[in-house]
Swiss-Prot record:
<dbReference type="InterPro" id="IPR018194">
    <property type="entry name" value="Ni-dep_hyd_lsu_Ni_BS"/>
</dbReference>
<dbReference type="Pfam" id="PF00346">
    <property type="entry name" value="Complex1_49kDa"/>
</dbReference>
<protein>
    <recommendedName>
        <fullName>Uncharacterized protein MJ0515</fullName>
    </recommendedName>
</protein>
<dbReference type="InterPro" id="IPR001135">
    <property type="entry name" value="NADH_Q_OxRdtase_suD"/>
</dbReference>
<dbReference type="GO" id="GO:0051287">
    <property type="term" value="F:NAD binding"/>
</dbReference>
<dbReference type="GO" id="GO:0048038">
    <property type="term" value="F:quinone binding"/>
</dbReference>
<dbReference type="Pfam" id="PF00374">
    <property type="entry name" value="NiFeSe_Hases"/>
</dbReference>
<dbReference type="InterPro" id="IPR029014">
    <property type="entry name" value="NiFe-Hase_large"/>
</dbReference>
<dbReference type="GO" id="GO:0016151">
    <property type="term" value="F:nickel cation binding"/>
</dbReference>
<comment type="similarity">
    <text>Belongs to the complex I 49 kDa subunit family.</text>
</comment>
<dbReference type="GO" id="GO:0008901">
    <property type="term" value="F:ferredoxin hydrogenase activity"/>
</dbReference>
<dbReference type="InterPro" id="IPR052197">
    <property type="entry name" value="ComplexI_49kDa-like"/>
</dbReference>
<dbReference type="InterPro" id="IPR001501">
    <property type="entry name" value="Ni-dep_hyd_lsu"/>
</dbReference>
<keyword id="KW-0560">Oxidoreductase</keyword>
<dbReference type="GO" id="GO:0016651">
    <property type="term" value="F:oxidoreductase activity, acting on NAD(P)H"/>
</dbReference>
<dbReference type="InterPro" id="IPR014029">
    <property type="entry name" value="NADH_UbQ_OxRdtase_49kDa_CS"/>
</dbReference>
């Protein structure tokens, strides 16, 4: 290491980090040139805990993989078992799942934008975003009965139906939310401070997206719209879903992808409710769970989430593997550092990834000469 090179730690406790991890930034003078990310502070072993449990208990654990996008985990868990057991859920349940999934996407993107704006010292816009988010949280609570761990999905459908009065309330609050959102996006697009701290900062080129296998708004901000798994979902195809993408690949592009995805999510919710009104019947079926292996993927707010499972005829989980989007997105971070002039920009580039640490934690054990050797997870 030359005389000008130095390493500084960020975390595991830091004002800009939503969850604990340590970023070891390598600096050449003031400019970041490399990073090493150390994890392991919040590993809980959920995959191992699920083994041997019935899938009706496993779905509650799946909801606790992530505290921000808990809903998409239960939806993917349920749809994986429905795929293995060839269970066809009612149309009502399909559209209600879309409504709730998109509400969760909106609230997650609003948190991501708020945290990013805090990292570039735009506290006013951050507080505005969190205030507007309460409209969405109220809708989620009205539909599911809860605000965080919603307990809404079951194998074979959903737990609660909605009525005409609730639908009118959703339409009314979405109108209010859209008006606020337009003002927020205008401030973000035209603000000189935001442009100074966001444009041409943390650039992730298209070829590095392909190399690191980044997913979600990260790769869509670098020109890869086909990464959105909603394009492959039959219900979203019925709703004529259109992916949002940009080519610049910088912090600004990633945040604008999230803002524009919120607009598309609002449209999808309205469209899903219109289709729901035309449906009749129940919201769930009695599920006969059959043994087998299978996997299912959905588009979480941060990107592709995968559940791979093996279950018995009685519904006991033999093995489960969960891959969350931040696993891939963290690897892309060090390539963003090349266009970060200062340490402060390295921090904002990190928040533009919108990482979720708790759902990324994994424990790897290597067996050598009959001895188990735990391996810590590091992204170099």
């Amino acid at each position: 290491m030359s005389e000008n090179m130095a390493t500084i730690p960020i975390g595991p406790i830091h004002p800009v980090l939503k969850e604990p991890l340590r970023i070891k930034l390598v600096l050449d003078g003031e400019k970041p040139v490399d990073a090493e990310i150390e994890m392991g502070y919040v590993h809980r072993g959920i995959e191992k805990i699920m083994e041997g449990k019935h899938c009706h208990k496993g779905i509650h654990l799946a909801e606790r993989v992530c505290g921000i996008c808990s809903y998409v985990h239960t939806m993917t868990f349920a749809e994986c078992i429905e795929h293995i057991s060839k269970i066809e859920i009612p149309d009502k349940a399909k559209y209600l799942r879309v409504v709730t999934c998109e509400l969760e996407r909106i609230h997650s993107h609003l948190i991501a934008s708020a945290v990013y704006n805090l990292s570039i010292e735009h506290e006013t816009l951050a507080m505005w975003l969190l205030n507007v988010r309460e409209i969405i949280m109220d809708l989620m609570e009205m539909i599911t009965g809860n605000r965080v761990n919603m307990g809404y999905n079951v194998i074979g459908g959903v737990r609660r139906d909605i009525n005409r009065e609730m639908m009118d309330e959703i339409y009314k609050k979405l109108d209010i939310f859209e008006d606020e959102l337009k003002n927020i996006i205008e401030v973000f697009e035209t603000g000189p401070l935001i442009a100074l701290r966001s444009k041409e900062i943390g650039i992730l080129p298209y070829h590095e997206v392909m190399r690191t296998r980044a997913v979600g708004p990260i790769c869509r901000g670098s020109g890869l719209p086909e990464s959105d798994w909603r394009l492959r979902h039959s219900t979203y195809q019925e709703l004529k879903f259109k992916p949002v993408w940009r080519e610049e690949g910088d912090n600004f592009a990633r945040m604008m992808v999230r803002h524009e995805e919120i607009i598309e999510s609002v449209r999808l919710i309205r469209e899903a409710l219109e289709h729901y009104e035309e449906c009749s019947g129940d919201i769930r079926v009695k599920a006969e769970i059959k043994g087998g292996k299978g996997e299912w993927r959905n588009e979480a707010p941060r990107g592709e989430v995968t559940y791979r499972m093996e279950i018995t005829d009685g519904g006991i989980i033999k093995r489960i593997m969960i891959r969350t989007p931040t696993v891939m997105n963290l690897e892309a971070y060090k390539y963003m550092l090349k266009t970060c002039p200062t340490v402060a920009d390295a921090v904002s580039a990190y928040t533009s990834i919108d990482p979720c640490v708790s759902c990324t934690e994994r424990c790897i054990v290597a067996v050598k000469d009959g001895k188990e050797i735990p391996i810590s997870i590091k992204f170099r």
